[in-house]
């Protein structure tokens, strides 16, 4: 059973707890964290969702992440989620806070990060029933990858804002990217 802290929409911690799978009372929210992983060489990690996933099966995820567990703050939760979902061990000083927003329909408060690492790219771990593959997409192929592959739309927007807006005006190299 997964237990979460409950927050108000403005991010204030309450005395309530929430349980995954149970309805969330009106006016309460749970904390969700996501992190885009960037390698020091400029490539971005995408994890392919398992084809048995209910939402976005066989789509690429640009982030590792999930719900913060009871007692965790956002930074603790994202370090744990990245380790569980990819095997990458990040430190808090590698995290760069990108944005946060409230998804009222889902009763979630999202904290979104990105991090740069020099982790061995060949040692990414897949999570059974969660992910089926991964790919490191070089910066010069990122625009093409986002245009031609199934990527979760909201995460695609993050990647574009973070790593492609700086590229506007430059010529794009649309060579094929290499699967692992």
Describe these PLM feature segments.
Residues 21, 58, 70, 97-99, ...:
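Nudix hydrolase/Nudix homology domain
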């Amino acid at each position: 059973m997964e237990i979460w802290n409950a927050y108000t929409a403005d991010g204030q911690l309450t005395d309530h707890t929430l349980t995954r799978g149970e309805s969330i009372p009106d006016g309460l929210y749970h904390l969700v964290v996501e992190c885009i992983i960037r390698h020091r060489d400029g490539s971005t990690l995408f994890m392919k969702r398992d084809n048995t996933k209910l939402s976005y099966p066989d789509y690429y995820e640009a982030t590792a992440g999930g719900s913060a567990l009871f007692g965790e703050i956002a930074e603790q939760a994202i370090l744990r989620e990245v380790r569980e979902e990819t095997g990458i061990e990040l430190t808090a000083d590698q995290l760069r806070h990108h944005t946060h927003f409230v998804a009222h329909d889902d009763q979630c408060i999202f904290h979104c990060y990105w991090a740069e690492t020099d982790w061995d790219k060949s040692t990414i771990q897949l999570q059974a029933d969660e992910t089926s593959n991964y790919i490191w997409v070089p910066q010069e192929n990122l625009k093409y990858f986002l245009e031609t592959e199934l990527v979760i739309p909201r995460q695609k927007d993050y990647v574009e804002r973070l790593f492609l807006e700086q590229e506007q005006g430059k010529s794009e190299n649309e060579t094929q990217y290499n699967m692992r």
